[in-house]
């Protein structure tokens, strides 16, 4: 009988393709429409005794309730027609309640594929119906009915197959279902009866999923063979599927044996009528309708009685609609009865089956033949779908774990679940397959299926594995697979569904073509074809799939049903092992349990059983199963091992008799065996690696493991991983750089093209091309005329046009252009003119032949053009470095673009210029003027930075070799960017520039261009200020050119603009934005690791540009020679400081020492206005030695005095801001030019109450001082330096000690560096209140009274940030200080670094206690010139009058310590209520400008941040603010590089000129130079480290002092 291919074959490819590995489904891709899925007689022994013979009569199968789904599938299958069909192996396992429900539910959407999972209703006569299905609920629909194979009953039945084998009555049902028209001798009688039935049963499979567990369908009511019946059923199912398009509702109805027999008879009669009607003999429409009505009535009655009332009702309602046959009801009914409950009795003849029965009137029985055979296969398929078959496949393959024969319900449910997702398409496919399956096994339970496989297949298909054999294997495999899948997948059901689908699909995919081709070609005429079809299928399977696949498929049989079976074996996880099926009840239940947990041992055991079963079944189905059995058996190596031990140790006595040597020999033998085994395994793995399976998807976890395990031979090297990041970053950076370069080039080209005002060269090119074309044509015509005149006349266009009067020769002659005058002068002969023209031809259309290239330098022509604009030497440099040549100005190099810059008038030379290759920073069409500017800028750069070679040198070109003017310019420009440089400090810097400039670090190549930019920009901004010989005009180009790079590098507002494509920018942006510190400087301070801009500026230059108006009202720093600076007026507000109040030094943010006072010889008076709040009870022992009003505010180390000497914020701000605004260069000078520094040691000897100058050089000679920060406040990231012990080693314990916790907060306040020292003195010692923190103070530190908090505004190097109290008291200030000036950075370590020592110690330093003050005074060298005591004009209400600062001792270096304003807040607990702040008001110059300056001097936040409970010493806050510009050192010291300029490394420190240098830049790490600095500053740093012996006064200094002075 010919099937309608479109009905069930067409869908296979569309939706049923499984993505599973080909082996997964036994190489059969079970698809509802796939003929490969058609169960064949050889699918496998339904029972040990019966072969599933399509030729057999339906009577043999009659006993089995055919649960034919409306699509011809078994009821269970109908219920889940699509899923079961698609998931061949899975549907077997899916007998659990969920799977049934799913199947039934999915049947609506997914047509039942009879072949996918023939609904084998396990008539568990031997076992409770629920057990086989695993249905625990007796009320469930399947409680009394055997689940349909579609729901995985088949798999359960595989376990139950053994039982089913005995239950021949059920087998006849299976046979009845499976007889695909092949009337076997056994079934012939029944076939006569059943073929009509089966043909009607195909309808019945749709409606009759009800299969009484009793094998009552054995009575074949029609002579039709099983094959015919199946064919009819399939045709009907196909019709229904086609009509319903997956709308068929497959309903399983429990039918009593009597009803089943009745239905079988009705179906057989219906089939007969349909056949007759098809043949056209008679029209039995009424009879067919009556039969269908009866069948529907039976099903309806049973459905009404069944637990699934809704499905039954839906079926009843849908029976009338053949298309919608209550598939939903059946599916729901099945879902209600999970496959697990072994209710194989569940006889659900879907209403679709009834409708089919009715439709079968239309459907000719002839279709039944092929379906019948197919039906036979579906029973086999049912077995195959069962986990056992899947397991067989896997077991044979050795994939016992892969047996997807999950619990019957589980696998089927999984299948159905998987395929419910694509229900519509699959349902159609499944419906078609289901038809076949319905014919084959739709009514069969797994038992029935197994039994039929064993019995039915036994006779026709001896090769097929006996159902019994398959049962144990399937049962075991199912359990194993289920267990494995349960672990492997979400559940055995799901696993089965997924895996089996994949496996089945793949297996079927490989096998499908064969079976499909066979069916399509031979049309699979019926049971007679079944054996051949099956054999062909098996053969094809063998050919297309490996033995494992074949074995899996052979487990049931490689018929379409077998294909399904194969799918299930692939689904072994979800499928039921045959062995389990042999134990239907226990298997269904156990499989469910196993599905949840995989039992490897059980699986292997099952595998062996499966092998045995497979072998037995193979005897019938064929060698394939046999091979599978072998493979399955092999996995059970344990058995052999067990045998070996027995042979080795047959008797314990023998074991006892074995001597040690013998035992050793045995062990050695075993070891060798094991070694060999391992070697073989490894070799096998290596062989697998040679031929990896990389195409098919993984079937399951075991497949993943097996496939991937061999790869362990490949070692995973760490190296590629370790350096990947860096390599990738490097490569990507390079790629990005190249891409940007190319993009810039393109942009420049486009820009030039856009900017071109003339298209002359393009026109010339076009004209030339046109002329050249005409010329060549003319030459060709001439040649032709000379050679072959006739041809020429015949073919010439000219002649033709002339003849046609289209060309007027005379007129053309007249229009010929005359020879140019310059050519007329030449007496050219005929051939000479063209040759002369050739000289002007374009080469390759390159009108600009001498095109500039980054790789090849301009030809002499272009050079000559550029030479007038750029010096040849620059050119050489430029050409020496092609990249510089690309940019008009190379910011890094600082040379103007030397490549010829075509002016707009030079059209041809435009392309010649290297602009094609220039980068973004180039400006394309530079006019000659611009080029001149660039040239001048280049010269300027050369003066400042030296030639490119010099810039390339590791050390920057020494400033000594730079013109003074250049230095001044750069300093002036850079100064605004140095917030902490005061005018005075700039002056000092100028004085010390000589020493500074030679240090290579002073000019860092990276910063040099920027510095130049800054200087130039600053000069442009403040031209009067810069006495530089270089004109601002020159500097401007330099600035502009370098600015682009600066902007890229720093991102400062002046530099931010991108100048790449445009001519050099004006200096306006720089003028507009004059930051106290260049943004790049700030960034550098943030990043300690960033290269330092080391610009050494001659003091003279700074002084020239400095406006030293140091009055309180001075907002701007007047340009004055630092030596002539006005005395700093420091306004000290001595106020009682509450313990909680941090010294309001924030306001007096210690900006970079604004003025580095010149050498001590000319101490400048520091006018400090001390406003002492009368509340201060503790007398401030601030002895101001007013030897000379030194501008440099003394670094006041307040002894426990609550008096807080802070310069009035307004004044300090004014001063700072004015200085910063007016001359940042001055600031830098001041910073750099502290000739005499006071060491941060306790400069004040309490006894003497005078500051003792300490030669700074001793302290810092030849090394960078490493200050340790006890606790870095979060706000000073850039100031954080690892704390070091006295030896300079990093201190492990960063937390300050309880007793000596000097928290130094270095904050930028109003542009000044404010250092707040919050010292937690030794709680045990009262002295702490009187201890002077050895905060670097100007030459005289005033030991304030115990409660005196002195805030000294020193325009000098800010106090070391390391001494900043790390506590958040100064948190805001810290934030402000995030703007990190290098100067500030250096200052944080050494407040004296940049403070001009010329400033006399301000009188603000009062020795609170004679002991401390003397110690401090003696040990703290006064950086200020001794003649410059700062008079503290502080109302000392309750404070001890500040002691006059002792003149620095002659032996000390008279370097005015460039101590930034240091606000020392020493709040003693006693003085908390009446703490007077002595704020030194430094005019806030930077505060307004510096974004980082956050708080005012007395910011309550700071105070609150300070430990409120601390004694005044604990609250000792030293805010070092740059000294007033007024403090001018009498003799300019070689300016120390402003701290900002030299962050860590100051080459100047190492420079020989540094003898009188102020404290060099403090570095994190110890210098290679001697540890003198550390030893000197050890106390200062130790307290920060918490390792200091501060509690015990060091060198006579009270333990509370922040710095103890070493003698």
UniProtKB/Swiss-Prot annotation:
Principal cellular location given in the protein's record: nucleus
Protein name in the entry: Abnormal cell migration protein 38
Record-level Gene Ontology MF annotations: copper ion binding; primary methylamine oxidase activity; quinone binding
Gene Ontology process terms (BP): amine metabolic process
SUPFAM superfamilies the record matches: Amine oxidase N-terminal region
Alphabetical keyword list: Cytoplasm, Developmental protein, Nucleus
Disulfide bonds listed in the record: none
General function of this protein: During gonad development, involved in distal tip cell (DTC) migration from the dorsal side of the hermaphrodite body to the midbody which allows for the formation of gonad arms. Role in gonad DTC migration may be in association with integrin related proteins ina-1 and mig-15.
Subcellular location: Nucleus; Cytoplasm
Extent of Basic and acidic residues compositional bias: 872-886, 907-917
Region of interest (Disordered), ranges: 14-52, 67-93, 167-222, 326-425, 459-478, 549-594, 845-931, 1017-1061, 1141-1241, 1319-1378, 1392-1445, 1517-1607
Biased composition (Low complexity): 195-205, 327-341, 585-594, 1333-1354, 1395-1419, 1584-1601
Tissues of expression: Expressed in gonad distal tip cells and gonad sheath cells.
Compositionally biased spans, kind Basic residues: 206-218
GO cellular component entries: cytoplasm; nucleus
Top-rank taxon: Eukaryota
Annotated Acidic residues bias: 858-871
Bias kind Polar residues: ranges: 81-93, 179-191, 349-371, 379-425
Keyword S-adenosyl-L-methionine in record: no
Phenotype reported upon loss of the gene: Embryonic lethal. RNAi-mediated knockdown results in gonad distal tip cell (DTC) migration defects whereby DTCs do not migrate to the midbody of the hermaphrodite and as a consequence this leads to abnormal gonadal arm formation during gonad morphogenesis. RNAi-mediated knockdown specifically in gonad DTCs also result in a DTC migration defect in which DTCs migrate away from the hermaphrodite midbody on the dorsal basement membrane. RNAi-mediated knockdown in a unc-6 mutant background results in failed gonad DTC migration to the midbody of the hermaphrodite.
Gene: mig-38
Coiled coil: none
């Amino acid at each position: 009988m010919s099937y309608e291919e479109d009905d069930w074959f067409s869908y296979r490819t569309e939706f049923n393709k499984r993505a599973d590995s080909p082996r997964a489904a036994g190489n059969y891709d079970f698809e509802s429409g796939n003929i490969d899925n058609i169960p064949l007689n050889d699918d496998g022994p339904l029972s040990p005794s019966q072969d599933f013979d399509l030729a057999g009569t339906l009577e043999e199968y009659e006993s089995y309730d055919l649960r034919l789904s409306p699509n011809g599938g078994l009821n269970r299958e109908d219920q889940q027609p699509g899923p079961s069909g698609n998931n061949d192996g899975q549907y077997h396992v899916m007998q659990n309640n969920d799977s049934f429900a799913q199947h039934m539910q999915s049947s609506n959407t997914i047509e039942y594929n009879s072949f996918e999972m023939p609904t084998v209703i396990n008539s568990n006569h031997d076992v409770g119906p629920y057990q086989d299905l695993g249905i625990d609920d007796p009320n469930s629909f399947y409680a009394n009915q055997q689940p349909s194979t579609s729901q995985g009953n088949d798999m359960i039945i595989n376990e139950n197959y053994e039982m089913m084998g005995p239950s021949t009555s059920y087998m006849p049902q299976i046979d009845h279902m499976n007889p695909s028209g092949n009337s076997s001798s056994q079934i012939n009688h029944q076939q006569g009866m059943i073929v009509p039935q089966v043909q009607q049963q195909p309808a019945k499979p749709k409606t009759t999923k009800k299969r009484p567990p009793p094998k009552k369908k054995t009575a074949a009511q029609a002579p039709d063979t099983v094959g015919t019946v199946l064919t009819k059923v399939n045709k009907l199912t196909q019709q229904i599927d086609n009509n319903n398009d997956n709308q068929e509702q497959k309903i399983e109805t429990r039918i009593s044996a009597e009803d089943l027999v009745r239905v079988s008879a009705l179906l057989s009669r219906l089939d007969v009528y349909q056949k007759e009607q098809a043949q056209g003999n008679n029209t039995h429409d009424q009879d067919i309708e009556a039969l269908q009505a009866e069948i529907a009535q039976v099903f309806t009655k049973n459905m009404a009685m069944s637990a699934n009332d809704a499905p039954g009702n839906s079926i009843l309602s849908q029976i009338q609609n053949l298309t919608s046959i209550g598939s939903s009801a059946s599916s729901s009914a099945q879902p209600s009865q999970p496959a697990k409950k072994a209710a194989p009795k569940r006889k659900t003849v879907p209403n679709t089956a009834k409708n089919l029965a009715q439709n079968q009137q239309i459907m000719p029985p002839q279709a039944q033949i092929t379906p019948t055979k197919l039906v036979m296969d579906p029973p086999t398929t049912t077995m195959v779908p069962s986990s056992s078959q899947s397991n067989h496949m896997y077991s044979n393959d050795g994939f016992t774990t892969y047996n997807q024969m999950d619990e019957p319900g589980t696998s089927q449910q999984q299948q159905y679940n998987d395929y419910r997702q694509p229900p519509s398409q699959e349902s159609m496919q499944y419906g078609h397959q289901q038809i076949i399956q319905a014919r084959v096994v739709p009514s069969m339970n797994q038992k029935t299926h197994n039994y039929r496989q064993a019995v039915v297949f036994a006779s026709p298909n001896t090769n097929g594995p006996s159902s019994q054999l398959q049962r144990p294997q399937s049962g075991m495999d199912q359990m194993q697979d289920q267990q494995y899948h349960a672990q492997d997948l979400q559940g055995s059901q799901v696993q089965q569904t997924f895996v089996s689908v994949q496996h089945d699909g793949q297996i079927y995919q490989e096998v499908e073509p064969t079976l499909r081709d066979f069916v399509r070609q031979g049309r699979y005429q019926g049971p007679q074809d079944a054996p051949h079809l099956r054999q062909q299928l098996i053969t094809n399977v063998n050919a297309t799939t490996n033995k494992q696949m074949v074995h899996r498929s052979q487990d049931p049989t490689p018929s379409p049903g077998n294909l399904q079976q194969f799918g299930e074996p692939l689904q072994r996880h979800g499928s039921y092992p045959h062995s389990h099926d042999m134990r239907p009840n226990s298997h269904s239940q156990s499989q469910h349990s196993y599905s949840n947990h995989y039992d490897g041992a059980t699986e292997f055991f099952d595998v062996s059983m499966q092998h045995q079963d497979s072998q037995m079944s193979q005897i019938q189905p064929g060698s394939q199963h046999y091979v599978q059995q072998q493979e399955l058996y092999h996995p059970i190596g344990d058995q052999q091992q067990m045998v070996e031990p027995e042979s080795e140790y047959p008797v314990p006595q023998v074991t006892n008799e074995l001597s040690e040597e013998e035992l050793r020999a045995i062990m050695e033998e075993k070891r060798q065996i094991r070694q060999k085994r391992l070697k073989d395994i490894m070799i096998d793995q290596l062989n697998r690696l040679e031929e990896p399976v990389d195409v098919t998807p993984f079937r399951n976890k075991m497949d993943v493991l097996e496939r991937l395990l061999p790869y362990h031979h490949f070692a995973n090297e760490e190296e590629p991983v370790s350096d990947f990041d860096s390599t990738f970053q490097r490569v990507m950076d390079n790629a990005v750089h190249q891409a940007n370069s190319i993009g810039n080039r393109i942009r420049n080209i486009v820009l030039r093209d856009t900017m071109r005002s003339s298209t002359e060269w393009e026109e010339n090119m076009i004209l030339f091309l046109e002329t050249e074309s005409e010329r060549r044509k003319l030459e060709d015509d001439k040649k032709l005329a000379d050679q072959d005149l006739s041809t020429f006349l015949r073919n010439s266009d000219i002649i033709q046009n002339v003849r046609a009067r289209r060309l007027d020769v005379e007129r053309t002659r007249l229009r010929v252009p005359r020879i140019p005058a310059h050519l007329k002068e030449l007496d050219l002969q005929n051939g000479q003119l063209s040759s002369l023209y050739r000289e002007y031809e374009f080469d390759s259309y390159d009108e600009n032949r001498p095109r500039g290239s980054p790789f090849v330098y301009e030809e002499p022509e272009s050079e000559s053009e550029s030479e007038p604009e750029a010096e040849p030497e620059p050119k050489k440099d430029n050409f020496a470095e092609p990249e510089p040549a690309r940019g008009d100005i190379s910011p890094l190099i600082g040379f103007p673009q030397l490549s010829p810059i075509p002016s707009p008038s030079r059209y041809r030379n435009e392309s010649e210029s290297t602009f094609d290759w220039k980068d973004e920073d180039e400006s394309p069409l530079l006019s000659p003027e611009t080029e001149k500017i660039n040239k001048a800028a280049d010269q300027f750069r050369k003066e400042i930075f030296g030639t490119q070679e010099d810039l390339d040198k590791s050390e920057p070109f020494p400033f000594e070799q730079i013109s003074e003017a250049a230095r001044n310019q750069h300093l002036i420009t850079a100064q605004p960017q140095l917030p902490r440089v005061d005018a005075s400090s700039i002056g000092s810097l100028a004085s010390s520039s000589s020493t500074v400039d030679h240090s290579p670090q002073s000019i860092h190549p990276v910063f040099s261009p920027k510095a130049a930019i800054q200087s130039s920009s600053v000069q442009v901004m403040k031209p009067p200020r810069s006495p530089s010989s270089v004109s601002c005009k020159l500097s401007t180009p330099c600035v502009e050119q370098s600015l682009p790079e600066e902007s890229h590098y720093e991102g400062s507002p002046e530099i931010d603009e991108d100048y790449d494509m445009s001519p050099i920018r004006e200096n306006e942006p720089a003028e507009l934005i004059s930051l106290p510190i260049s943004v790049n400087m700030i960034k550098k301070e943030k990043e300690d690791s960033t290269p330092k801009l080391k610009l050494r500026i001659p003091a003279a230059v700074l002084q020239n540009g400095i406006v030293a108006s140091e009055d309180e009202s001075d907002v701007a720093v007047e340009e004055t020679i630092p030596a002539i600076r006005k005395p700093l007026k420091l306004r000290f507000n001595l106020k009682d400081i509450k313990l909680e109040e941090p010294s309001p030094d924030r306001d007096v943010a210690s900006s970079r020492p604004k003025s580095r006072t010149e050498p001590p010889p000319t101490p400048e008076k520091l006018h400090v206005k001390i406003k002492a709040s009368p509340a201060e009870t503790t007398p401030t022992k601030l002895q101001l030695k007013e030897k000379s009003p030194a501008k440099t505010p003394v670094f006041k180390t307040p002894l426990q005095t609550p008096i807080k000497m802070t310069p009035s914020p307004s004044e300090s701000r004014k001063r700072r801001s004015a200085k910063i605004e007016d001359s940042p260069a001055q600031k830098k000078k001041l910073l750099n030019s502290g000739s005499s520094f006071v060491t941060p040691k306790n400069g004040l000897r309490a006894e003497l109450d005078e500051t003792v100058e300490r030669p700074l050089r001793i302290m810092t000679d030849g090394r960078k001082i490493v200050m340790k920060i006890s606790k870095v406040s979060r706000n000073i990231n850039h100031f954080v330096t690892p704390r070091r012990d006295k030896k300079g080693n990093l201190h492990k314990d960063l937390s300050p000690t309880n007793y000596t916790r000097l928290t130094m907060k270095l904050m930028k306040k109003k542009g000044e560096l404010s250092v707040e020292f919050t010292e937690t003195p030794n709680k045990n010692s009262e002295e702490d209140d009187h201890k002077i923190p050895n905060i670097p103070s100007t030459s005289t530190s005033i030991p304030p009274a115990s409660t005196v908090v002195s805030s000294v505004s020193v325009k000098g190097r800010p106090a070391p940030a390391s001494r900043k109290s790390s506590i958040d008291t100064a948190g805001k200030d810290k934030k402000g200080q995030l703007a990190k000036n290098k100067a500030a950075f250096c200052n944080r370590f050494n407040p004296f670094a940049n403070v001009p020592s010329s400033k006399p110690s301000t009188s603000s330093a009062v020795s609170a206690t004679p002991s401390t003050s003397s110690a401090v005074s003696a040990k703290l060298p006064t950086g200020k010139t001794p003649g410059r005591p700062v008079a503290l004009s502080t109302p000392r209400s309750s404070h001890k009058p500040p002691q006059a600062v002792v003149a620095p001792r002659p032996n000390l270096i008279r370097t005015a310590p460039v101590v930034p304003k240091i606000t020392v807040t020493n709040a003693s607990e006693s003085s908390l209520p009446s703490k007077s702040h002595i704020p030194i008001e430094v005019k806030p110059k930077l505060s307004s400008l510096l974004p980082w300056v956050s708080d005012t001097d007395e910011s309550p936040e700071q105070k609150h941040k300070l430990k409120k409970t601390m004694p005044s010493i604990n609250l000792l806050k030293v805010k070092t603010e740059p000294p007033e510009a007024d403090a001018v050192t009498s003799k300019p010291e070689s300016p120390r590089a402003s701290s900002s300029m030299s962050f860590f490394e100051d080459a100047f420190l190492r420079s020989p000129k540094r003898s009188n240098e102020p404290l060099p830049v403090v570095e994190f790490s110890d210098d290679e130079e001697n540890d003198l600095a550390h030893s000197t500053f050890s106390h200062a740093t130790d307290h920060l480290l918490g390792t200091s012996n501060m509690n015990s006064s060091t060198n006579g200094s009270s333990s509370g002092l922040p710095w103890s002075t070493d003698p």
